[in-house]
Amino acid sequence: MEQILKILKQMLSPDQAQILLKALKNSNNENFYNFALENIEIICEWLNSKEFQENYTNHPYPPLLNPNYIDTDASRHCAELAWDLNLPLPKHYKFIYISPHGVGAAAFLRYLNEACNVFCLASWMLPYDAKERYCINYMCLNDKNISDQAINISELNIINLEKYLALLDPHSKVICGIRDPIGILKHNWGRDWSKVQRNFQNEFDLTYDYRNYINFLNHKKP
């Protein structure tokens, strides 16, 4: 770390140095530390570049390398490095599908996957951690055996969701599933919930803390 700090002091302004230091602080990936040390001059050159200043100065998670000149593969190693380097997800997806609960998302995803040959993972089947979701999508998007893909977003209570959203292409096409409120209530009332895993007790009495149910029903930030 002392070697990195010495180089940063020589090559970057305090504000630019904080970009890399923040990324190092937020990571527990030893491979990322080693990568940053081995490529510190390339990272500094990019942070000093005109392209970075014009495009990423105000970005909440600016990339530490030029995302347009990165050679990657579908490995977990590359996916984790890309997350720590704040690299946007590869732009190989056709669109983003936003699906609030109760709008027929499962049926639409089946239509995409089976009828349209567009591979799209159901977000509610993925871990509730944005890094894991990013890595899974990153590996899929770099898999040459999968041609057409889309990304599904359905939940808000995901760890590090803000970073995940910031690493999506802001110019992507978006399909948003909607439904009238009464229709959503009818759907949820008539649905078979027997196969749904719930994170709260299904038996309670007057001493039970009702806030557990309210917190489950409400979207919340982690």
Segments predicted by a language model, with ranges:
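PAPS-dependent sulfotransferase catalytic core
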Residues: 1-145
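Serine/threonine-rich low-complexity intrinsically disordered regions
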Residues: 1-2, 13, 29, 39, ...
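PAPS-dependent sulfotransferase catalytic domain
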Residues: 157-222
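Short, flexible helix-coil linker/hinge segments at the edges of structured domains or between repeats
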Residues: 123-127, 133-150, 193-214
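Conserved nucleotide-sensing/catalytic segment adjacent to the nucleotide-binding pocket
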Residues: 131-175
